[in-house]
Amino acid sequence: MTPEELSLAISACLKDAVAAGEIALAESAVPEDVRVERPKNRDHGDWATNIALQLAKQAGTNPREFATILSARLKTISGVSAVDIAGPGFLNITVDAAAAGALAKAIVEAGTQYGTNTALAGHTVNMEFVSANPTGPLHIGHTRWAALGDAIARVLRASGADVTAEYYINDAGSQMNTFANSVYSRLHGLPVPEGGYPGQYIADLGHEVLTAHPDIRELTEVAALPVIRAAAYEAQMKDIKATLADFGVAFDVFFSEQELHDAGAIESAVARLREQGHVFDDGGAVWLRTTDFGDDKDRVMIRANGEPTYFAADAAYYLSKKDRGYTEKIYLLGADHHGYIHRLKAIAAAAGDDPEVNIEVLIGQLVSVNGAKLSKRAGNIIELKDLIDWLGKDAVRYSLARFPADSPLTLDPELLKKNSNENPVFYVQYAHARSRGAARNAVAAGVERQVDGADSFDASLLDHATENELLSYLGSYPSIVAKAAELREPHRVARHLEAIAGAYHRWYDACRIAPMGEEAVTDVNRTRLWLNDATSQVLANGLDLLGVSAPERM
């Protein structure tokens, strides 16, 4: 019995109790899906629900009385062996071995779809992350946002949301002029300009510009700078996209800030917000009255000299997302962007959206690496591409995804290079590789999931304590994915995979899949192969949500 099947069965029992007049609830108040969770103490049963505590007040009764009525009906469900009432009205449900074991076959049949749900169906989400300036290579700070942002997008999609992963290119403003000036100076053997960009990569970009425009040195500075700016920008974005691809991060949209300016979107945004009554003029400048929406001060949109501010571009960009039909806009920003929370929510409110529903600003903490070598090419930073070459994509992505975004993080390269259980990514990947190896060995020994074209599976044979433990973790996986999507916390998936890996290793050591020596293949062997393959599937599904590979061999 899967958690979903039990959830639907509880809902059906509730509806029957309401129809019979045993519980005084409107039928519309009965949820289609009732949340079930694994109790912390497995002596309290296989599954628990607090539905009685949720609905008792509406039914005009106390939770224990509500639970008593519901438990009588739950005991009649096929596969349920016991129902106990705990505390103020919690229902603890125990399923028999056959019902519990049936999950293994259900997982194998569901394949890559196991763990997906429709909780966020109908949600159209714009997920913006990384958005590094195109003036240099991606570094370690961007690495965490790339890993987290992509993992969040994946768990949202697994919960039914329509997600667009978007990279906002800050290609307008003074930093682009400084970037062009830095490349120009290198081309002409001049010192790095004040406030300019150092690093060998600037010289490399200069070489690319020279290759594309051999006569660039013959042009005047005024004529050369626009050419250099465009060519160096294109080359740097190509490098950024290649690095992201190597890291396994794919963006659906690369959105140019400069295009907002060129299309008149800034002026349009000011006009639209003025029509809403939120824009005013003062001191020759144009302001958005963000204090009406909880900001600590009003924000300038157009300076007195007629130049738009970055804030104006932020407003135009938000309106672009709104106009493109996104019901939810998620921004993943660094720790130095705390001040953006109120101003972005103020923009949303001024645009007529609900800042508690239509926009979400996630703030992450910085990450460091013990013993990392600074990149001379990039000017004393740790480059993402160097991290990938040094530690491997999987180790970096998994390590960054297994901690909450708002917790400071220091990566330990020595740990991540170990092929031991101390290394979390190795621990989980090895469990998957071990399960695939076990399946190959079982098949070589004559164990198949089918006999004469029919499935050979007897769930009641999965009655060992380690099998019950493993099944419990596999059964909890869908609710973990749903919670990770709801809270934007993919680390929940990583930690659960580690629990599954541990349970699998304990089961593997206790229960043989393949027969030994001349032993005959039995239904126990075949049924255990189903459980083994179910574990492989869940580990692979979970690793994929984190952007990490599931190796067949290690």
Swiss-Prot record:
Record's keyword annotation contains rRNA-binding: no
Range of residues in the leader sequence: none
'HIGH' region (motif): residue ranges: 132-142
EC id: 6.1.1.19
GO MF term (any one): ATP binding
Keywords tagged on the record: Aminoacyl-tRNA synthetase, ATP-binding, Cytoplasm, Ligase, Nucleotide-binding, Protein biosynthesis
Subcellular location: Cytoplasm
CC terms in the record's Gene Ontology section: cytoplasm
Assembly: Monomer.
Protein name: Arginine--tRNA ligase
